[in-house]
């Protein structure tokens, strides 16, 4: 409103307060830049007066939670489909979203904390609802998704899109719970042992499978794991021998991480044996889109190991049919991101986890021609639903330089196939590459050569 109090942080850390008609202000480097953005915001978001002099509300506003590649890709999809300027909420801007003109960014300190998130988001939603008919909230991380599910009753009537219930989320928010769900519905999953903090050392002597093994926290994206620190910390661990595992456990036990550990048999195959399935289920729980991807290379640095660096979109109708039945039996709504691996010993896919949101690599769907945000908006805002779309287009998405793919994709046939495609890069968007942004992105890409040189290993 006209009496809004806006706090401007100057480059020297000083505060300036002023009254301004605009509700939102991006995180500025100085006062002059902020005033420029405020003017741009007013021009872009002030609805034209309706008949009778009252302001007409715009159809919808996307509100994106996060600032990684996923957040940037989501903003790209909305801008491409509807020409709208999303609002991005985060605790800090990461490299993929810095110096971008695709959205407006608002920094909210401690936004990911349970005691801050509900009131902060509620305030934003109430302000936005004055100018927009419908608000779409898109979380780009597990913890934002969890916060939305747990506190959704606070936002009911303000958020147009739906999320799974907190009760359903509880059935798969950790890997041990997800495997119990797989058992219930007859889905394949890797042989698994769950160890409490007290069992971390002793469990290695009672494993029903041999080394090599894969070890993960029960939720590697949970804040309690992300905020703890110990030597050798990774999202996913691969161990060839008992002694390697115990060395990691001794280090972990010195930290304040008290979550469970998941120990699994290693399914034979490298990165290209992995599969990722992105889906959208409408407000009534019917699957409306599915896109399968074959990762051809993963990241290997400790903070990103297990994340996908490049994906070829694929199609597998038998898998689509089976996973659609699974999701609809669950009563799933919204986006899902399912990680799995092809087991060459059985010819079947084993499931690793469901992420109740799209992942960092989900722009591979757009490379295949599928805009997930358009499906969401048509469903929730405009009430348009069509038959389920099953992707069968092959296309390449990559988040690393092509030179890395040529060097580290070891399968000769796959390497040859990659040469036929020009990769889609989510963070390099034509028309959104000012020099300040381009400089950071090129440094970001160049650093990947060092990361792969230092951390890459062959999974056998």
Where do the language-model regions lie?
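Active-site nucleotide/adenylate-binding loops and adjacent lid/helix of ATP-dependent enzymes
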Residues: 169-262, 283
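Peripheral (often C-terminal) accessory segments that flank ATP-dependent C-N-forming ligase machineries
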Residues: 378-460
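Short glycine-rich anion-binding loops that position phosphate/pyrophosphate groups of nucleotides
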Residues: 12-17, 142-144, 218-220
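ATP-dependent carboxylate-amine ligase
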Residues: 1-51
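Glycine-rich phosphate/pyrophosphate-binding beta-alpha loops
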Residues: 296-300, 304-308, 355-369
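Conserved metal-phosphate-binding beta-hairpin within the catalytic cores
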Residues: 327-363
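Phosphate-binding site of ATP-dependent enzymes
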Residues: 239-301, 314-321, 342, 348-350
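ATP-binding N-terminal substructure of ATP-dependent carboxylate-amine bond-forming enzymes
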Residues: 44-164, 201-202, 453-458
């Amino acid at each position: 409103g006209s009496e809004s109090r806006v706090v401007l942080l100057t480059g020297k850390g000083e505060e300036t307060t002023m009254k301004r008609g605009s509700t939102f202000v991006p995180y500025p480097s100085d006062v002059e830049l902020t005033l420029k953005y405020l003017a741009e915001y007013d021009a872009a978001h002030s609805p034209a007066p309706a008949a009778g002099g009252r302001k007409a509300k715009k159809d919808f506003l996307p509100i994106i939670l996060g600032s990684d590649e996923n957040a940037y890709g989501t903003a790209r999809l909305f801008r491409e489909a509807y020409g709208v300027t999303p609002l991005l909420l985060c605790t800090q801007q990461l490299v993929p979203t810095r110096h971008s003109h695709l959205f407006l960014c608002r920094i909210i300190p401690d936004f990911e904390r349970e005691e801050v998130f509900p009131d902060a988001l509620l305030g934003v939603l109430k302000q936005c609802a004055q100018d927009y008919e419908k608000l779409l909230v898109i979380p780009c991380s597990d913890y934002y998704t969890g916060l939305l599910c747990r506190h959704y009753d606070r936002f009911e009537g303000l958020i147009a899109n739906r999320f799974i219930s907190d009760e359903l989320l509880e059935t798969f928010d950790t890997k041990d719970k997800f495997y119990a769900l797989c058992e219930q519905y007859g889905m394949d999953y890797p042989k698994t042992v769950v160890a409490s903090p007290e069992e971390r050392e002793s469990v290695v002597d009672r494993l029903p499978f041999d080394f090599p093994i894969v070890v993960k926290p029960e939720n590697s994206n949970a804040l309690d794991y992300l905020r703890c620190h110990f030597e050798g910390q990774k999202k996913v661990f691969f161990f060839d021998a008992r002694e390697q595992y115990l060395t990691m456990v001794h280090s972990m036990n010195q930290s304040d991480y008290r979550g469970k550990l998941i120990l699994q048999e290693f399914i034979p195959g490298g990165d290209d044996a992995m599969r990722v399935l992105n889906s959208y289920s409408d407000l009534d729980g019917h699957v409306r889109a599915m896109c399968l991807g074959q990762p051809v290379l993963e990241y290997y640095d400790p903070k990103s190991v297990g994340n996908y660096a490049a994906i070829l979109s694929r199609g597998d109708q038998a898998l689509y049919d089976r996973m659609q039945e699974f999701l609809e039996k669950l009563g799933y709504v919204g986006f899902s991101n399912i990680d799995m691996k092809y087991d060459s010993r059985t010819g079947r896919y084993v499931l690793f986890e469901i992420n109740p949101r799209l992942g960092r690599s989900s722009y591979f769907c757009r490379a295949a021609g599928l805009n997930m945000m358009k499906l969401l908006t048509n469903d929730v805002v405009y009430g348009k639903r069509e038959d389920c779309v099953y992707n069968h287009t092959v296309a390449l998405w990559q988040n690393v330089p092509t030179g890395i793919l040529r060097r580290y994709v070891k399968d000769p046939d796959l390497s040859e196939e990659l040469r036929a495609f020009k990769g889609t890069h989510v963070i390099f968007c034509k028309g959104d590459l000012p020099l300040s942004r381009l400089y950071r992105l090129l440094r970001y890409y160049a650093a990947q050569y060092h990361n792969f040189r230092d951390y890459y290993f062959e999974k056998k």
